[in-house]
């Protein structure tokens, strides 16, 4: 029996709640199925528009869940519902969901009817949090898939295509958890769970020595040798390697302990350094039970190397107050030993080694999500014709990406930290004196008196006139961003107000934990999950800072990082319970609700200004909070530079278009901090290469610990480096019409600025795994150089387009790898044939010459178009239609460039503008100063056609 219900025939049933069949109940916008068997007792599927569904599965009968923190949309749309051959089908205009009556499994088809997402195993496991019952949840899809998978936030292990990878989503200084995936099959999957979540293998990795057997000298366990200097202090057998957290340091052998002393703020380890050299060597034979690719995760800080059968497989350094995971894989055969050796210079650091056995190939290559704490399996399917449409659909669920003010896309100068207002202002004055473009200066932490963290006040000796400081910066056409934390010392008036209302977390205070400042001070964070707490927090911030005229808000440590190097269990204890429930249930969502409170406050307090927030962490929906994200306290290492490419691209593909990184890396090895002569050349080259990458990132921001990062400081005495940095800065400003347009498109077209090659070239499978290049808007292919001394690099040019070398004008056919020239002062950069790239005048800040001339660079070889965007740059009036577009279209066949009639307008818009057109043909290099012009005219808003000479 086939049953099909149209909307007219459903009206009475909707009113009466009549079941459509014994196993199926029609509800507004969808159905609830009670399967015959399986883990889920009830499965609800609801439509969210014309291409999205929500699936909720529970092992009991209750489907009433709290309102999602991530999703702001409501169920909408009326699918055509049919029951046939044991399936209930919900058909929308652009997507179809099918539910099996036998076990409640759901599968999804695209607009053409092609199966793209198919549930496999589903599991619920009883668990608890704060003594209350909850569920650990697990859902697998698409076993044995060959699709490309992207998104999931920002991760630091050079993972681009997640197919076959394992990723833990748990907020951390450098790791951002956003449980949203986008697939080459043109669907997205939003996993609506706020707790710690895993993609891939749901089983946590085990210490090497627990699951994977290890032996040495005929005995179980590792041979561990502890050295003080060159002297062997302790040799012992250890079952596994685990110095991951502060609590684990108690296991350090007494005879191998070294004296520690405090280190300078800018040194390798602000928690202290050891006196003399300290090292540990672990060696052992590991014997696997399974044949296949074994995965390892080394959690480490300081210098560490890993060798397998004598071959180095990993070499990393990371600052000790911010250790993190480093992944590697080894092909291993069951029963065949592999000799592992780990060499570590701990310097009072942290280290642990974990392992995961190979999964069956259909499981390794699947979409598999699991969460520690929840109430149900709850996820959203989002369909589309391409990845851009999928990301747009995700934003339709979780909120549009707010436009940033135009000055946010200029250059940002920062350092850790300006100690006085005179230091900050002197930097701005020097940039202006040298005519180096800049728009933003940043006041990092510790502008307050030492014992007053959370007062949002200024140390009067160092910052005697913060209002005057802001005013002078403004007079120099520069905005000021200031650091504001969710952290409080309990003695401050702000903390006392929050405490009186019950809005401070108590765990850190009960533990009497002290921070690293001065003698150390007890501290904690506020609880943003209560609306009243968010209102108090913003009012305190407004009265102390917003009213002084600061322009942008650096929301640091928003994971929250209440105390570094605590275990997950300790972190949960310190960050809860929240006003909405156990901390374990809300582990990943703090940065979202915190940013929402600040953004809402800013919109109310300053209704004529677009807010700008820079936050270290984010969650699903953070793009709606006027927030840009950055990649945390990464290190000044070539491998970290390389890691930022895939980190930024995947965050962008998670629906967050505004992203940045600390140019040069935040934390430094002592060889750089001390400017050791043997390493100065590498330090400078690293910063220059990173600066080149930064100029083609969504936000262009220099920041880090000593040495000073200002262009005129870091390049002092190196004329070629200085000139290259200034040239890239000026190029960024020349490109501002292009950059601001692609930035505006993130709102108006739900676009993405920093694009994985796979987004534009999904049919070219070679693009799927490229983790060292990306597209910056539709025109530019950016290929950062990430190795010291490299003067060429291989660049894959995607099939389906021609590519101009930006430096030489040589036109390459796509679908090939070219060896691009990469002198120290230049980064390989390519432009897609058919691109139209608008550039502007030579300016020193974005507000200069709002009516300045435009050059339209037309890269011939294919037809193309560009919609040049303008608005007032600072207000939210763009949301009311106050903006202008100039459509530009290039027809390769006729050789005609059509500049269309201006569409729209806004207050202060230039009515006329000088426009030049330059056509590029193979072999013609892009003119760096943009002075040369083929044809020039005055554009008054009327359409005009220009023909190629």
Regions found by a protein language model. Give the residues of each.
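Solvent-exposed beta-strand/loop surfaces of large extracellular or lumenal domains
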Residues: 63-81, 268-270, 308-328, 507, ...
């Amino acid at each position: 029996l086939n049953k099909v219900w149209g909307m007219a025939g459903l009206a009475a049933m909707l009113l009466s709640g009549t079941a459509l069949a014994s196993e199926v109940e029609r509800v507004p916008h969808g159905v609830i199925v009670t399967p015959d068997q399986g883990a889920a007792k009830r499965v609800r599927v609801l439509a969210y528009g014309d291409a999205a569904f929500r699936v909720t599965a529970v092992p009991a009968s209750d489907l009433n869940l709290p309102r999602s923190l991530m999703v702001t949309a409501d169920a909408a749309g009326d699918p055509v519902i049919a029951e046939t051959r044991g399936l209930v089908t919900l058909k929308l205009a652009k997507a179809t969901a099918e539910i099996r009556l036998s076990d409640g499994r759901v599968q999804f088809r695209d607009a053409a009817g092609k199966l793209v997402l198919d549930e496999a195993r589903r599991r619920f496991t009883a668990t608890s949090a704060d003594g209350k019952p909850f569920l650990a949840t697990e859902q697998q899809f698409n076993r044995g898939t060959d699709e490309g998978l992207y998104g999931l936030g920002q991760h630091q292990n050079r993972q681009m295509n997640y197919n076959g990878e394992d990723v833990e989503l748990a907020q951390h200084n450098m790791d951002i958890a956003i449980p949203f995936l986008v697939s080459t099959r043109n669907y997205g999957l939003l996993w609506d769970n706020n707790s710690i979540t895993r993609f891939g293998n749901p089983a946590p990795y085990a210490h090497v020595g627990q699951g994977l057997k290890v032996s040495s000298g005929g005995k179980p366990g590792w041979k561990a040798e502890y050295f003080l200097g060159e002297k062997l202090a302790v040799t012992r057998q250890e079952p596994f390697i685990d110095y991951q957290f502060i609590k684990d340091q108690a296991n350090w052998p007494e005879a191998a302990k070294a004296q520690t002393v405090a280190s300078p703020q800018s040194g390798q380890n602000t928690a202290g350094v050891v006196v003399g050299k300290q090292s540990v060597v672990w060696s052992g034979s590991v014997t696997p039970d399974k044949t296949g690719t074994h995965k390892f995760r080394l959690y480490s800080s300081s210098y560490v190397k890993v060798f397998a059968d004598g071959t180095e497989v990993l070499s990393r350094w990371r600052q000790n107050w911010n250790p993190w995971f480093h992944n590697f894989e080894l092909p291993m055969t069951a029963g065949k030993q592999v000799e592992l050796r780990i060499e570590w210079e701990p310097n009072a650091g942290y280290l642990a080694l974990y392992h995961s056995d190979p999964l069956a190939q259909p499981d390794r290559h699947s979409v598999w999500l699991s969460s520690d704490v929840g109430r149900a399996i709850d996820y959203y399917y989002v369909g589309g014709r391409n990845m851009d449409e999928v990301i747009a659909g995700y934003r339709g669920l979780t909120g549009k990406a707010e436009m940033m003010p135009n000055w946010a896309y200029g250059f940002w100068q920062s350092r850790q930290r300006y100690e006085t207002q005179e230091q900050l202002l002197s930097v701005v004055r020097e940039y202006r004196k040298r005519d180096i473009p800049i728009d933003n200066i940043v006041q990092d932490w510790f502008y307050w008196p030492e014992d007053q963290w959370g007062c949002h006040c200024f140390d009067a000796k160092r910052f005697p006139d913060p209002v005057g400081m802001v005013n002078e910066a403004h007079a120099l056409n520069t905005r000021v961003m200031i650091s504001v934390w969710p952290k409080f010392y309990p003695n401050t008036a702000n903390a006392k107000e929050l405490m009186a209302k019950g809005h401070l977390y108590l765990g850190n205070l009960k533990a009497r934990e002290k921070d690293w400042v001065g003698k150390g001070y007890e501290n904690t964070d506020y609880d943003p999950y209560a609306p009243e707490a968010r209102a108090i927090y913003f009012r305190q911030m407004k009265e102390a800072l917003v009213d002084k005229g600061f322009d942008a808000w650096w929301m640091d440590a928003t994971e929250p990082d209440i105390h570094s190097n605590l275990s997950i269990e300790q972190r949960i204890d310190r960050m809860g319970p929240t006003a909405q429930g156990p901390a374990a249930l809300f582990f990943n969502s703090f940065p979202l609700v915190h940013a929402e409170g600040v953004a809402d406050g800013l919109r109310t307090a300053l209704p004529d200004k677009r807010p700008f927030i820079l936050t270290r962490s984010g969650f699903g929906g953070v793009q709606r909070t006027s927030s840009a994200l950055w990649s945390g306290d990464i290190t000044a290492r070539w491998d970290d530079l390389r890691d930022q490419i895939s980190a930024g691209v995947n965050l962008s593909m998670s629906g967050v278009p505004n992203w940045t990184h600390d140019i040069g890396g935040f934390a430094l090895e002592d060889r750089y901090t001390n400017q050791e002569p043997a390493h100065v050349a590498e330090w400078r080259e690293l910063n220059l290469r990173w600066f080149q990458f930064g100029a083609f990132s969504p936000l262009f921001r220099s920041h880090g610990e000593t040495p000073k990062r200002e262009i005129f400081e870091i390049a002092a005495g190196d004329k070629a480096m200085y000139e290259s940095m200034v040239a890239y800065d000026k190029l960024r400003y020349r490109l501002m019409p292009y950059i601001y347009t692609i930035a505006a498109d993130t709102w108006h077209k739900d676009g993405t600025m920093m694009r994985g090659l796979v987004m534009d070239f999904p049919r070219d499978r070679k693009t799927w795994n490229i983790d060292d290049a990306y597209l910056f808007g539709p025109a530019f292919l950016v290929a950062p150089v990430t190795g010291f001394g490299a003067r060429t690099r291989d660049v894959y040019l995607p099939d389906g387009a021609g590519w101009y070398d930006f430096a030489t004008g040589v036109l390459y056919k796509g679908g090939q790898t070219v060896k691009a020239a990469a002198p120290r002062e230049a980064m390989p950069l390519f432009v897609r044939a058919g691109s139209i790239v608008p550039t502007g005048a030579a300016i020193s800040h974005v507000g200069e010459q709002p009516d300045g001339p435009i050059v339209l660079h037309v890269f011939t070889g294919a037809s193309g178009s560009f919609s040049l965007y303008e608005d007032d740059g600072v207000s939210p009036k763009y949301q009311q239609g106050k903006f202008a577009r100039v459509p530009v279209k290039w027809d390769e066949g006729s050789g005609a460039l059509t500049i269309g009639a201006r569409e729209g307008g806004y207050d202060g818009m230039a009515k006329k503008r000088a426009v030049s057109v330059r056509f590029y043909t193979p072999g013609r290099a892009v003119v760096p100063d943009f002075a040369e012009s083929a044809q020039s005219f005055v554009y008054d808003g009327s359409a005009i056609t220009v023909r190629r000479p």
